[in-house]
Amino acid sequence: MTLQVDCERLAAAHLIVRRQLLAERSAPSHWSGELSSSPLSTATAISALVLAEQGGTSSGLPVYTPGEEPSHAHEIYRGDLSELILQSVRWLAEQQNEDGGWGDTDRSVSNIATTMLVQAAFHLTGVPAKYGNLLQRSQEYVDSQGGVTGLKRRYEGDKTFAVPILTNCALADMVPWRKVPALPFELASLPQRWYHLLNLPVVSYAIPALVAVGQAKFHHAPPRNPLVRWLRASARKRTLGVLTDMQPASGGFLEATPLTSFVVMSLASIGLDEHPVVRRGIEFLLMSVRPDGSWPIDSNLATWNTSQALTALNWNLSDQLPAATTKPTDDVESALDWLLNCQHTQRHPFTGAAAGGWAWTDLSGGVPDADDTSAALCALSAWQRRWPQQRGTDVKRAARAGIHWLLGIQNSDGGWPTFCRGWGKLQFDRSSCDITAHALRGIYSWRGLLQIESVNTTFIKKIEEATRRGLQFISQNQQPDGSWMPLWFGNQWNAQEANPVYGTAKVLTMCHELGIPRSEMAQRGLLWLVNAQHAAGGWGVVGPVTKNPADQACSVEETALATESMLQFSPHHPLAEEAAQQGVSWLIEAIESGRHLEPAAIGFYFSKLWYYERLYPQIFATSVLARANRACHAVSQAAGVM
């Protein structure tokens, strides 16, 4: 392609963002990143700590045997817990939006779920009088959104988040218990392998909420039916055992503040404040609070960040471009060891996932999933292509296990879900186009590298059949306008909170890497993405718009992903070449002005819970500008030869 941009400015921008990304390493081996502080997480943590403090012990604090207590948590417990809670309440007060509500981040519009949870936290702390005007304004916002009815409407029948939110509100005496739907927690006592057959009202990764929140509802508002009442009473002890077995060493379910908080507050409210699950959950909350009194939605996305960063950098952790060494340096070897050690080698107790997958984090609360496993496979294949003679046995062994893991969770519809095969009732358990595209990329990235083509034809046939079915799923789920919708990413300025730019860019990248850029679905997707480009050259919100401040119209993340797919397709379509040039120019200007340090809240964590990750714009921009830089140099060299 002919990339008509200033190659010197491009190289300088690439160097800026690349060095910034390298400087963000938590250690020589990996990137922990930093998730946005979350009013929703902070509110649920406050509620959990307050309800635990009001529990059955004289001090309201968990009792640890000598030598068992964690030092940091113990120090906070021995001090004044109320000081932490008041600091967190002050932080929440500072985050209120002009319309009276709260959003999921400091860059998010208000939503009814977060606002109701913040209200509950204020009520439970016993300090609403000090914030009377604040609470009055928030109630006006909640009323304008439809109250409890509006909350249920937001989650469209998915009880995973709606019921825990209503439970939190009921514990704060904001909502009567009769408005909190009951959850059949007794079903958790059945064998885990049956869960996907039970038509549960929550997603596969929310069993802890099913148990704890379900028990809270049962305790505070038992069912009238004596048979149901007896059945659930008899299942309490067994399901608490399930909860105990699922809790990771860190105490944080999924390393997630909201999920852990819902479990802690629910059990504490029924007199189980000294239960080991509650004690470990409180320890997790106290260990994960930030200096300003806020909590993120999760501890970190270290594995996800690291896999993508290593791929974007092509395993070159040196300031020099290209790297001066012909073999991996010590820090590169360390990064490989770290990523290999993140692979789960045993069946996971939380979802029953088989060995072989990767989670989003290296911490104990992580659970293997398709997106992170695919990212790790892409990173490892980049290593194998760069250094085929180095650590080949270890890398190939991990890759084979990862591919087998992905093949094992492919759904019957041909698509890939996030965590578990066969859970198709609720949106966040269904197959999705972005995850399916990533799984296909992860598997296909190892073509020709495993050296098994001639000795394991059965494995190859499985891969070919899985690929065929995956492509069929993606084709069948293409939108009429040519775009694809992702599952775990959105755009808050879109009226449906959808992000077809992210989804379409991910699918187009897959089409390029699988060698099908000229397929009908790829060409339709390409035309849609070209037409979605803003006049300024970037990508961002498309379709019906709710609010659209000028500075939020385009993001570095969306522009980088879309531009990379345009660069990949530029040899096949002149419109892609023109769009790529405009996208690269937009990114150069964005990096020169420092916008790559301003992440956008495009991530979903659970259903409709927004977040941003500080490293996303840096990782995505590093990847696309590396590709653009190579294209620019190729053009310059060709011109020099002529």
Regions found by a protein language model. Name each.
Residues 16-29:
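N-terminal signal-anchor module of multipass membrane proteins
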Residues 1-15, 30-67, 73-87, 98-136, ...:
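An alpha-helical repeat/solenoid feature that recognizes helix-turn-helix modules
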